[in-house]
Structures are given as structure tokens and as C-alpha cells.
Amino acid sequence: MRTEYCGQLRQSHVGQQVTLCGWVNRRRDLGSLIFIDMRDREGIVQVFFDPDRADALKLASELRNEFCIQVTGTVRAREEKNINADMATGAIEVLASDLTIINRSESLPLDSNHVNTEEARLKYRYLDLRRPEMAQRLKTRAKITSFVRRFMDDHGFLDIETPMLTKATPEGARDYLVPSRVHKGKFYALPQSPQLFKQLLMMSGFDRYYQIVKCFRDEDLRADRQPEFTQIDVETSFMTAPQVREIMEAMVRQLWLEVKGVDLGEFPIMTFAEAERRYGSDKPDLRNPMELVDVADLLKSVEFAVFAGPANDPKGRVAALRVPGGASLTRKLIDEYGNFVKIYGAKGLAYIKVTERAKGMDGINSPVAKFLTAEIVEAILDRTGAQDGDMIFFGADNKKVVADALGALRLKLGKDLSLTDESKWAPLWVIDFPMFEDDGEGGLTAMHHPFTSPKDMTADELKAAPEEAVANAYDMVINGYEVGGGSVRIHRGEMQQTVFGILGINEQEQREKFGFLLDALKYGTPPHAGLAFGLDRLTMLLTGTDNIRDVIAFPKTTAAACLMTEAPSFANPAALGELGIQVVEKEAKASLENK
């Protein structure tokens, strides 16, 4: 039906007859002439109808926005005064000779001249996806997956599918459960990741595996999360962590070159401890120049418990954050930032405004200055590199609260005060994570997952001091987003059982949930390591959006609902009966519980 795409016509097509298919983006009547902007997935081209083609002109008068049409005509160059430099096709236009209205459109529920609500966009997603910016994002996503497949194939990786219906295993979030009709009372789980299957593939001898795969997590959603998401999943045998990072870094660098024409350069490597200490985050945005600076040693003897308490506590921390030009912040804004850090557990936000350093104590403004000597203030200003016009904010609490609060404040100030250089790309690797973290109930939980190997520890050493264990894990971070994460896996049964034990999984539960894995580890398991990238987040970065729903064709809301299809929906009672499931209404359930 078509010979060319609208958005691909150029001056090289001048003089050619073409047939286009697409939608009316806009119509303009200029006396005896009618112009339309015709759109398809590749872009927009101007088409005009003149009196010499009376039938086409008459039919064109019926056109309205979003009519689906076919146009045959001749490409010609625009007069110089009419060239539109803002359009890729702005140097040409199509003189229509034939017009077919394939399908008419009713008045649209979306307004192309105004910003529509996200609710409306998701309800009429098929219309929203016609917008050029949305089409471009999905084209970029397709380009990314095409590149990844080529790269992986060139490097000897095999694309192997793993099951969608599997067994529920604890991986940190709730599973989506699928009831079995054949095995009544039993449930499959949709995979949170192909983690165990890809490890089993390594045990099977497939030493380089990858898959672009859907994963599912039934968790409370945030703006950058979806209940179903896509991973670029990778696993290798007989490769060390640095070797895995090297090949994956090469892939991402080539991807950025192909999609953005940008060389990211060699990725710096930073330990988890350094990232938390300097940036208050394990995924630091290095485009932001501000850093957290430890000042506890300067404040141990001050008569101000807010500072002295954490400064003298081995589990405490006092850190300063210098904000260039921050002295201009109003009291109202300072109070707002004080309330902001309370979200992260901080009790408030002490500060020093630096107006004129040369005047000493007279050159600063601070509600805590009365507790500090001139020497201490000068030492703080020196250590933070403060200059006239700067602001210094303080965090004083346990180490986690200080890192979380000042880390979040750093990001917010970077955005609010335009201190973060949005034109830059700042990738890095973060390594050497703690293997375990406090679960808040006196136990430990795996920081990554329970199949991650410790670094340079035997099973006995791990059992004796699990809180000291460093995971042989690594995350790739770009502009403050964790785009990929992985680790060296446990390949010995004794170590795997030790980790399960530390996590409070007894031997019976180990056999019930992971018996197949423990059995597989008995038969010559090779050392293996891998990584998974979030395709959605990669696409967000490469298309310049901060909304994950902008890069997924048919996403869910933050309530895990599809407004277009109205999923989830109630199931047919007969189908539930076949599954042996009975829905208990809330009122009936409450009545039963009261009994």
C-alpha cells in the first residue's frame, strides 16, 4: 500500500512519485489550496492539494485529525522561503494526485494541543502512542534490543529461554502466583528473574547465556517501577568479576555510541563504602559536584549534643555538605529542606551560611554558631572548601540516616539549584557491597540475593563473621540510575547452605525450596558470574525521560492496573471452580474471622 514512510522523504526523492500511508496530523485551508501534515511512525511530511486535482482536493476538504489515509503524489522541493528547518522533511513536500480515506476518526479523547493527564494517556494508549515523541521512544527501545542481540551473538552468547511458570522462591519481593488446574491447591509463580535457571544453564555447560526477558514482582510500586519489567539477562562460566564487567562495559559503551553518538569513556570503579561516604548513595550521580565530608573529629568536644553525640558514637556520623552559592537560600527554603530530610529519618538540618570568610565568625550566619569556636568553624570551612556565598548543611545521626538524608538532599539541591550538569554522562561501577544487611528484626537479609558469593571468605569464616562479609557483587550506575547489577555466584554446596543458614532458612526449608539447586551443585558446578540490565531504565536514559511508563508500550499504573483493558478483572466463577478457588468477599471474611 505504501512505497515510502512519510518521515523518510528527503531532497533525494524530489521528482519521484510516492505512495504514503498514515494519519492526518493537521489540516490547513489556504483559499483554493489545502495543506495537511501527514504522519506515520517515522515522522511528518507536508502534503498539499491544488485545484488541478479537483477530486483529490474535494476529498481533502473532508479530512480531519487522525483520519487514516493513503496519498499518492510527487515529491517536490519547497521554495526557499517555505523551508521548515525544524522538520527533517522540511525541505520538500508532496503534491497529491490521489487520496483515499482508509478510515475516519471520531473526535479524539486526547487533546493534541494541550498536555493530557497520564490517566487519559494510559486509557487511550493506542492514541497516545501515535505521538511522534512516543513513537521515537519505542523505536529507540527496538534499536537497543537489536543492538544487544548483535553484540551478544558476536561475543559467543546463546539466547536461551527459561520458564515463565516456575516455583516460588524467596527473592526479595512478592511473587505473582498462578493457580494450577491440574494440580489443585498448588501454584506456579511468575519469575522475578531467571536467576536460578541461568545458573543451572551454567551447570549444564552453556558457558555464555543471555536473554531479553520479562520479569514480574508484586511489590508496592514507585514512579520508576513496574509489576512486569524487562531484563537483559546475562550469565557466564569461567569468567572473573573484572572480566564480566569488561565485556558488559564494552557493550554499554558501544550502545551509547550507536544510539547517542557519545563515547562514555572508561568507567571508574568505586567501592560501596566510598560511594556511601562521599555521596550518601550506592548509585551516585557523579554529574553533581557536591560531596559529603566527614567532620565528626572536629566536633567531639563541642557542648552541643546534636553534634557531640554522633561524633563520639562508633555507629554515628557527622557530615557536612557544601552547597555552592547556597547562602542565597531563604529561611523558607531552608525550612523546606529541613522538612525534606526528616523523610529520611533526620531530626533537622543545621547549617552555616558563609557570607564573608575574611571576617571570621562575623562573616557567617548560623543557628549553631554559638556552640562552635572560631577555630572549629574555620576548620570546617577549610575541610569543605567553603567560599563566600556558600552554604554548609550538616547531618548528625547514625551512619545510615546521615547517608540517606544528605544523599537525598544532595540530589534535590543539585536539581533545584541547577548544580547537576544535565549535559554530561557519568557512568561508574560500584563494587564490594556488604553481603548482608540488618532485616530490622534482629536477623540478616541478603543485600543482593542469596546466591551471591562472598569475596575471599571460606564457609567457616563466613559463618563466624557474616556481618563482615563483602559480596563479590557489582552494579553499573549511569547518572544516578542503577542500570545493571550482578555478582559472582556461589558454586559450592557447602557455601550455599551456609548462606541459607545465615538467612534463617533451615535445612528442611532449603530442601523444599532449593533442593534442585543444592542437588545440581553436587555435580561439578563451574565458577560462574553474571549480570542483568534493566532494559526499561536503559531506554529511559537513552530517550531522556524520567518516567518509566514512557518507554513501555502498554504499562501499568502505580496501582499495577491497566486503564485501557481494565486489568486486573474479576474471573469467571466457572473458571475459578475448575481451579478449586473460591473468592471470599471482605464482609464474609470478616464475619468468619470474628467467629
Curated annotation (Swiss-Prot):
GO terms for molecular function: aspartate-tRNA ligase activity; ATP binding; nucleic acid binding. It is found in: Cytoplasm. It comes from the Bacteria. Belongs to the class-II aminoacyl-tRNA synthetase family. Type 1 subfamily. GO terms for biological process: aspartyl-tRNA aminoacylation. Gene3D superfamilies: Bira Bifunctional Protein, Domain 2 (3.30.930.10), GAD-like domain (3.30.1360.30), Nucleic acid-binding proteins (2.40.50.140). This is Aspartate--tRNA ligase.
